[in-house]
């Protein structure tokens, strides 16, 4: 069937236009709801016995789990399109099955604020790890006041407990809803 007003069109053209208007143009308002992810590798580490290592093809910090003086640091800036936090997770893998005991500290703030205007701390945390399997440690509760443009410093350290094997620290995954 051909249409002649306002210009000549075929039924296929009208159906395509209707689908475009309904499913693409009208739904563009929801694009801001998409969750974005940012991968943050470790920056540096401190402690005797710590070294750079590998887990498969991943570069890692190999943390010998029997010393409380082992620290791995992360630093990053929160993206400008950040609207709200969907999750902050540390990706690790253990060389042996163990219960890992750890502490996490964080300080963050924006330009013009003190470096520790927002702080978070979790001490004597534990997580059961299975040998050679990825594990995500949820750190979301430590950055509850996170905002676009904030500069974040975060460190992971062994707590007082005895841990077996080696923990490979791979990186942080920041998940957020964008503006």
Report residues per predicted region.
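Extracellular "spike/adhesin" assembly and maturation modules
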Residues: 1-36, 50-57, 73-77, 101, ...
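A short beta-strand element within beta-rich, extracytoplasmic domains
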Residues: 83-94, 172
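Short beta-strand-plus-loop segments that form exposed binding edges in beta-rich domains
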Residues: 155-163
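Terminal beta-strand-rich extracellular "head" domains
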Residues: 97-139
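Short beta-strands within extracellular/lumenal beta-sheet-rich domains
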Residues: 64-85
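N-terminal targeting leaders for non-cytosolic proteins
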Residues: 38-49
């Amino acid at each position: 069937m051909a249409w002649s007003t306002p210009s000549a069109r075929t039924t296929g053209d009208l159906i395509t236009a209707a689908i475009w208007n309904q499913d693409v143009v009208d739904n563009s308002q929801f694009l801001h709801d998409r969750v974005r992810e940012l991968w943050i590798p470790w920056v540096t580490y401190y402690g005797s016995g710590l070294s750079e290592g590998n887990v498969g093809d991943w570069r890692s910090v190999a943390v010998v789990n029997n010393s409380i003086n082992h620290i791995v640091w992360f630093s990053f800036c929160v993206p400008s399109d950040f609207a709200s936090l969907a999750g902050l997770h540390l990706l690790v893998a253990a060389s042996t099955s163990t219960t890992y005991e750890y502490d996490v500290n964080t300080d963050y703030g924006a330009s013009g604020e003190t470096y520790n205007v927002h702080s978070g701390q979790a001490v004597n945390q534990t997580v059961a790890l299975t040998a050679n399997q990825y594990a995500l440690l949820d750190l979301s509760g430590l950055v509850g006041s996170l905002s676009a443009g904030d500069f974040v410093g975060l460190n992971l350290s062994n707590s007082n407990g005895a841990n077996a094997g080696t923990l490979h620290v791979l990186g942080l995954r920041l998940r957020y809803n964008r503006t």
